[in-house]
């Protein structure tokens, strides 16, 4: 049974984050921002204009500094004095969907609806790079742990890209539509699992494990795909059906076990997976990939793809039939999941779920 935090929002909650001290911050529709005590009481609130707050993220080096996105703006706040933004940037071309601050707090990445990613040098307070390669909405961007100049992005163009801040082009790209075409042989299995076969694999979210080399993607086809980064490329490790509708959220938990993965979906379900069982059990290289052959219909000139693309083998995914991971925890939340986070609340690791109701739901994680 979930514990509900109420009284902070009258509109749908869109995003959550918690700092190392367990302070929780939530952002909602119509510009409403709220901080919460461990008792579930609103501590302070701020209205950041009329635009929805789409992302909140604490600095990894200063637990009092909070980065938020609302509309085309980025506000930097001091949560000790939540009266107004300490600084505000308006550098993006369209509504911002996602922010990511690297571990050293030297750079901030902001992905928007135009498909662009703005890289802000936080020391000089200016844009140092603009990354333009997504042809549709860039839904998520995230810096890799232990690698402050490397980041991943994904979008509704069904592309996942690996970037290095020293370059303006992605160093590696995977097209999920091509990946899905190779997975069509799994159709019978997917029907049995209740997946929506006709949903395109629009990529909603990525999360990187603490090692910095393993990451997960959640997509509109309900699947969760696990990749491993080796050097300047990444390859498919495993893919499985996580939700009967789109997988909107994936988050690696910051626990002693590095591969606990939390997922949330448009089916109203929240699940916890141990994806390390597969990664550690195999103890082998990722499934081999080969560069995709250039054809008239898919040449870089036609598609604007100037980076390497790979044609991922579906072999790993076919093994789902016998190796589909079982959820360690499955929660019927009952509403489409807008956001997932985790925090230590009253000494217990806890899942926090945001949805359209304006409440924050808490589910305890036990025996992990």
Where are these regions (language model features)?
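A short helix->beta-strand "capping" segment at the edge of beta-propeller domains
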Residues: 1-10, 40, 187-190, 316-329
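Canonical WD40 repeat/beta-propeller blade segments in eukaryotic WD-repeat proteins
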Residues: 10-17, 51-58, 89, 93-101, ...
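Short C-terminal beta-strands that terminate individual repeats in beta-propeller domains
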Residues: 3-8, 43-49, 86-91, 128-133, ...
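WD40-repeat beta-propellers
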Residues: 33-37, 74-78, 117-121, 160-165, ...
């Amino acid at each position: 049974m979930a514990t509900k935090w109420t009284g902070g929002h009258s509109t749908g909650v869109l995003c959550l984050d918690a700092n190392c001290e367990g302070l929780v911050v939530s952002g909602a529709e119509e510009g409403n921002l709220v901080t919460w005590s461990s008792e579930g009481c609103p501590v302070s609130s701020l209205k950041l204009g009329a635009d929805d707050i789409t992302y909140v993220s604490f600095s990894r080096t200063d637990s009092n500094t909070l980065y938020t996105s609302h509309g085309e703006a980025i506000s930097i706040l001091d949560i000790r004095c939540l009266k107004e933004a300490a600084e505000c940037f308006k550098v993006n071309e369209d509504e911002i969907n996602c922010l990511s601050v690297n571990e050293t707090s030297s750079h901030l990445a902001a992905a928007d609806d135009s498909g662009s990613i703005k890289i802000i040098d936080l020391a000089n307070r200016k844009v140092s790079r603009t990354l333009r390669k997504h042809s549709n909405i860039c839904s998520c961007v995230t810096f890799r742990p232990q690698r402050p100049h490397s980041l991943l992005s994904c979008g509704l163009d069904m592309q996942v890209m690996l970037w290095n801040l020293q370059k303006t082009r992605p160093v590696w790209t995977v097209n999920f539509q091509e990946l899905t075409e190779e997975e069509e042989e799994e159709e019978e299995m997917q029907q049995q699992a209740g997946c929506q076969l006709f949903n395109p694999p629009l990529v909603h979210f990525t999360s990187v494990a603490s090692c910095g080399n393993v990451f997960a993607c959640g997509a509109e086809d309900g699947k969760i795909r696990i990749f491993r980064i080796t050097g300047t490329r990444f390859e498919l490790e495993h893919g499985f059906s996580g939700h009967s509708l789109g997988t909107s959220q994936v988050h690696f938990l910051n626990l002693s076990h590095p591969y606990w993965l939390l997922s949330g979906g448009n089916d109203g379900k929240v699940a916890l997976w141990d994806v390390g069982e597969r990664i550690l059990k195999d103890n082998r290289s990722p499934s081999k990939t080969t560069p995709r052959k250039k054809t008239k219909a898919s040449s870089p000139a036609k598609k604007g793809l100037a980076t390497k693309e790979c044609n991922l083998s579906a072999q790993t995914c076919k093994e789902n039939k016998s190796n589909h991971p079982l959820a360690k925890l499955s929660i019927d939340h009952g509403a489409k999941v807008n956001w997932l986070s985790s925090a230590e609340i009253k000494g217990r690791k806890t899942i926090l779920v945001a949805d359209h109701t304006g409440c924050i739901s808490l589910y305890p994680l036990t025996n992990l």
